[in-house]
Amino acid sequence: MKQKKDSIIKMKSSEMLYNFLETTQLHKKDFAQMIGVTLSYVYNLIDETIPFSTRSTTLERIATVMDISPEEFVEYKIPQDPILIDETTEFIKEKLKEKKLTTVQFLKSFPRKQRSEIVDILRGARPIPLNWEETSTIAEILDIPKEEIYVHWEARLKQLMQNSGFNFEQNSGLGNAIFSCARNYVEKNN
């Protein structure tokens, strides 16, 4: 009896995934790249050749792309340590809502190799990139002024500098000069 119940559980998650891919007409190859797995893995999940993933990272990535909560998958176990969603992630999600962009539309705007990184940013597992070009690409895709995302990039860089031993109180002049220069660059190149 337990085996029958397990197959119903697998079928439900597999069906959810299959229905999502059909509804959005998202190619399985694109989906695989977005969540950082192989195409054969996606086919195996849908065909139930393998059990649906119980790995929280994979389930969170799948849920992020599907715009659902990972808890909707019965296989998902809530992690002991809660995932903290930072202000930047919330900012990006708000902009997606304002622009009426789905997660899939947003992800398709990025190069294929970068999509799984963006999924990790949206699920709160990765901060925005320190590479300004990558961060400014997010602003371009969201069609917002780069100054709006710059604030989040600056906060991320300050946090990294502090964690690396930079004392902003003792080096306020240098810190102010660094970020004044960066702000000027962003304003001139917007």
Task: State where each predicted segment sits.
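Interfacial/linker helices and their anchor residues that mediate assembly or domain coupling
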Residues: 83-109, 140, 153-190
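Short C-terminal boundary/hinge segments that cap the last helix of small helical domains
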Residues: 67-83, 140-160
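Key DNA-contact positions within bacterial/archaeal DNA-binding proteins
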Residues: 29, 40, 71, 116, ...
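DNA major-groove recognition helix of helix-turn-helix
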Residues: 46-47, 58, 66, 74-77, ...
